[in-house]
């Protein structure tokens, strides 16, 4: 009976993991906020495109696309990316809520991968833009 319970638990665990959707980014594609803030402060962003895929462009120098869970904003992102070289470093962020709940970062990052961008990054804001950027006094758009 004990073995049957263990096997049932393993099967349930495997099934639930298979049902969970994988994030479209790798850990190596997460950019630390301190690194981006340093690059902005030291004016080392000439080769970098920073894109907000959430409700507001807060990070200094970022382009406001709008929430990409909305199809029209995802299409706006697609159009914005048309003239950007595929090897250009692109950092996207949202920050509306914790990563696990964010409706915007997954479709936007998946689009970057679909379009073949080789140097795409996701700004690592695991909690939200306030906690992980604003409260640290990192550079913002005026």
Each model region followed by its residue ranges:
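Rhodanese-like catalytic fold shared by cysteine-dependent sulfurtransferases
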Residues: 4, 16-30, 57-142
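Flexible, polar/low-complexity N-terminal or interdomain linker segments that lie immediately upstream
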Residues: 7-58
């Amino acid at each position: 009976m004990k073995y049957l319970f263990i096997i049932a638990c393993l099967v349930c665990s495997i099934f639930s993991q298979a049902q969970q959707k994988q994030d479209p980014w790798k850990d190596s594609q997460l950019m630390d906020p301190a690194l981006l803030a340093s690059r902005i402060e030291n004016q080392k962003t000439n080769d970098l495109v920073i894109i907000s895929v959430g409700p507001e462009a807060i990070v200094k120098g970022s382009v406001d696309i709008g929430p990409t869970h909305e199809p029209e904003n995802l299409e706006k992102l697609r159009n914005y990316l048309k003239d950007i070289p595929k090897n250009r470093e692109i950092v996207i962020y949202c920050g509306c809520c914790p990563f696990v709940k964010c409706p915007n970062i997954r479709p936007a990052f998946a689009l970057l991968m679909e379009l073949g961008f080789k140097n795409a990054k996701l700004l690592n804001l695991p909690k939200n833009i306030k906690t992980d950027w604003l409260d640290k006094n990192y550079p913002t758009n005026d």
